[in-house]
Amino acid sequence: MTKFSLLDHESVPKHEIISEGELKSVLSKYLIEKEQLPKIKVQDPVSKEIGAVVGDVVRITRKSQTAGEADYYRLVIE
């Protein structure tokens, strides 16, 4: 039996953990603190699949009719 990957499903946008350098850039761009980012739980199936841990920030790249692609950021919480 093969394991199904959530990330391979067409309805699931691309998720990836960002580096500290990219995080600093995002926070300064939006003039916010890390804790002000929207949240995603560490128990979320996609969080588990990408190996996210509490405190990581995940970039979600979604298709957009107006922008082509749009990035969203989520702070991983317990």
From Swiss-Prot:
The UniProt record lists the keyword Acetylation: no
Annotated keywords: Cytoplasm, DNA-directed RNA polymerase, Nucleotidyltransferase, Transcription, Transferase
UniProt EC number: 2.7.7.6
GO aspect biological process, one term: DNA-templated transcription
InterPro entries cross-referenced by the UniProt entry: Arch_Rpo5/euc_Rpb5, RNA_pol_subH/Rpb5_C, RNA_pol_subH/Rpb5_CS, RPB5-like_sf
GO molecular function: DNA binding; DNA-directed RNA polymerase activity
Main localization (coarse): cytoplasm
Catalyses which reaction(s): RNA(n) + a ribonucleoside 5'-triphosphate = RNA(n+1) + diphosphate
Location within or outside the cell: Cytoplasm
GO cellular component: cytoplasm; DNA-directed RNA polymerase complex
Signal peptide residues on this chain, from the entry's feature table: none
Family: Belongs to the archaeal Rpo5/eukaryotic RPB5 RNA polymerase subunit family.
Name of the featured protein: DNA-directed RNA polymerase subunit Rpo5
The gene coding this protein: rpo5
